[in-house]
Regions:
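Structural signature of nuclease core domains in nucleic-acid processing machines
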Residues: 1-359
Length: 359
């Protein structure tokens, strides 16, 4: 759906093969395997040691790489180094994710949840007409929950090998729907597990899988270095602005959280740099994404495949598109034009979503 919102022809064409530069599959597989190894070792995300992380990640990366035999991953010294680098990055990742969990009261509830194993969920079956139904495909990297006597708070995390940023305007235009779709499915799943409790969306977050370097003109202690690395690996996304939810996500938040995209001003209110939405705004965004997916699905079935990719400021769908020859778009030919997308602020976006839902 996001590809179709960028340029219609991108929906129909898929690339095959494995690129060394695209390590996403390995990252996801190793992180899923790590969670399984914790359970096998009677450990949790809170109490595993750094030595356990180093050993488990290294073995998992090497085992996964071995499944490719003497193909791409071992085809050169450079690619062999990539395996070592992945081990380092993923060790940093599991240690950082451990620290994130220790900051709050959430615990992982599901990993790599494929929609194929959630066939009963209404949120992944979209009625386009009385005769036509669309089935969504996807995989939720991680669902975390925090519970009390009456509520289940839900956090959805999507692992990214690139530095993905949550963009409400991109969501509005149909370019960034995935994370909300995952939250809708996770909310429904938790409601079936806990029919006697209220299910509350807590956070929709991207985690950048990376091992950042710290450049400083002065010598730092190991603790200071780790603090700066943790700050660079703070999750990006949107958080429920309810103080109870924020406190469950980060018990130690004072002025700027090290784990979620939330900052506070001196008076205790959230700063404009915070990625927050109210409970009502989250519900609106959820409903809007459902409607947007239904509209896009209807257009795909109706055969609307005009070559009119989007353009928003300096960003455009064609910049890194591998399907230009398939698309045939040529701006120099009369009749070809790109969709110009406005750069809108949060208040305007929420108002337009509300108007769309009321129409």
């Amino acid at each position: 759906f996001e590809n179709r919102s960028k340029a219609y022809s991108k929906y129909f064409d898929k690339e095959t093969g494995f690129e060394v530069s695209d390590m996403g599959n390995i990252y996801h597989a190793v992180l899923e395997n790590f969670a399984g190894k914790l359970a096998e070792s009677n450990l949790t995300w809170w109490n595993f040691s750094e030595d356990f992380a180093l050993k488990t990640v290294k073995e998992s990366v090497e085992a996964y790489a071995a499944t490719y035999g003497e193909t791409v991953l071992y085809s050169s010294a450079r690619n062999e180094y990539a395996i070592t680098r992945m081990s380092r990055i993923l060790t940093r990742t599991v240690l950082t994710l451990q620290q994130h969990l220790k900051q709050g009261s959430f615990q992982p509830d599901d990993y790599e949840l494929s929609f194929r194993f959630a066939e009963e969920l209404d949120s992944i079956h979209v009625d386009l007409s009385e005769e036509e139904k669309m089935h969504l495909q996807g995989r939720i990297d991680r669902i975390d929950v925090s519970e009390d006597a009456e509520h289940v708070y839900v956090k959805v995390i999507d692992y990214k090998s690139g530095n993905k940023k949550f963009d409400l305007a991109a969501l509005y235009y149909g370019l960034q729907l995935q994370l909300v779709v995952y939250m809708n499915a996770a909310m429904e799943l938790e409601s079936r597990k806990h029919p006697d409790k209220e299910i509350v969306p807590a956070a929709l977050l991207y985690y950048h899988i990376d091992d950042p370097t710290i450049e400083t003109p002065v010598e730092l202690t190991d603790e200071q270095i780790n603090e700066q690395i943790l700050a660079k690996l703070r999750m990006n996304g949107v958080v429920n602005s309810d103080p109870e939810v924020v406190e469950r996500l980060d018990h130690y938040l004072q002025d700027k959280s090290a784990v979620i995209p939330v900052e506070k001003k001196k008076d205790g209110s959230f700063s404009a740099r915070s990625g927050i939405l109210s409970r009502e705004e989250m519900q609106l965004v959820s409903a809007y994404v459902d409607a947007k997916i239904r509209d896009i699905g209807r257009e795909i079935l109706d055969g609307k495949i005009a070559a009119n990719p989007y353009e928003k400021g300096n960003e455009e769908a064609c910049t890194y598109c591998a399907y230009k020859k398939v698309c045939g778009f040529d701006g120099s030919i009369p009749g070809y034009e790109k969709r110009q997308l406005e750069d809108l602020d949060k208040q305007t976006l929420m108002q337009r979503m509300q108007e769309t839902m009321e129409a």
